[in-house]
Amino acid sequence: MALPKRIIKEIETLTRDPPPGIVAAPTEDNLRYFKITMEGPQQSAYEGGKFHLELFLPDEYPMMPPNVRFLTKIYHPNVDKLGRICLSTLKKDWSPALQIRTVLLSIQALMGAPNPDDPLDNDVAKIWKENEPQAIANAREWTKKYAV
């Protein structure tokens, strides 16, 4: 099945003008499956880390959001142990007007501003709420250990 023009155009834009700190490229054998490398945002607990993610565009895209998950372990209240991400634009707030680029920038922004009030990992969120300095130290430690 041929790729929709929308996906082809998004791939061209991501290649020509990648978002800062993000490299996103489809695999050669499946142009709906992207390998992502995302730098941790500056002045965050993830600064200096390189995080690997996978993004898959379902057949219904752009009517349905892409499936995205972290492959690199990350200590974050909005990411579970399987790498799934709690982000409203990937669920209830998805709009066909959004693009892959927007999704990736939203994930990078979530790294810079974790939201322990809407967690996917309750244990991490509890620490983040009760002892934020300790949670940030844990996130930095995991970044140094896993996101190199």
Swiss-Prot record:
Molecular function (Gene Ontology), one example: ubiquitin conjugating enzyme activity
According to its UniProt record, this protein's enzyme class is transferase
Can you list the GO cellular component terms from the UniProt entry? cytosol; nucleus
- Which residues constitute the catalytic centre? C86 (glycyl thioester intermediate)
What pathway, per the record? Protein modification; protein ubiquitination
Q: Where is the UBC core domain?
A: 2-148
**Which cysteines are disulphide-bonded?**
none
One GO BP on record is: postreplication repair
Which reactions does this protein catalyse?
S-ubiquitinyl-[E1 ubiquitin-activating enzyme]-L-cysteine + [E2 ubiquitin-conjugating enzyme]-L-cysteine = [E1 ubiquitin-activating enzyme]-L-cysteine + S-ubiquitinyl-[E2 ubiquitin-conjugating enzyme]-L-cysteine
Gene3D superfamilies the record matches: Ubiquitin Conjugating Enzyme (3.10.110.10)
Coiled-coil region(s): none
Q: Does the keyword ATP-binding apply?
A: yes
The EC number(s) attached to this protein equal 2.3.2.23
Q: Which InterPro entries match?
A: Ub_conjugating_enzyme, UBQ-conjugat_E2_core, UBQ-conjugating_AS, UBQ-conjugating_enzyme/RWD
**Keyword Cytoplasm annotated:** no
Q: Name one Pfam family in it.
A: UQ_con
Q: Print the keywords alphabetically.
A: ATP-binding, Nucleotide-binding, Transferase, Ubl conjugation pathway
Which CDD domains is this protein grouped with? UBCc_UBE2N (cd23813)
Role, per record:
Has a role in the DNA error-free postreplication repair (PRR) pathway. The ubc13/spm2 heterodimer catalyzes the synthesis of non-canonical poly-ubiquitin chains that are linked through 'Lys-63'.
Tell me the protein family, please.
Belongs to the ubiquitin-conjugating enzyme family.
Tell me, how does this one assemble? Heterodimer with spm2.
Protein name as annotated: Ubiquitin-conjugating enzyme E2 13
Organism, by scientific name, is Schizosaccharomyces pombe (strain 972 / ATCC 24843) (Fission yeast)
Query: What is the name of the gene encoding this protein?
Result: ubc13
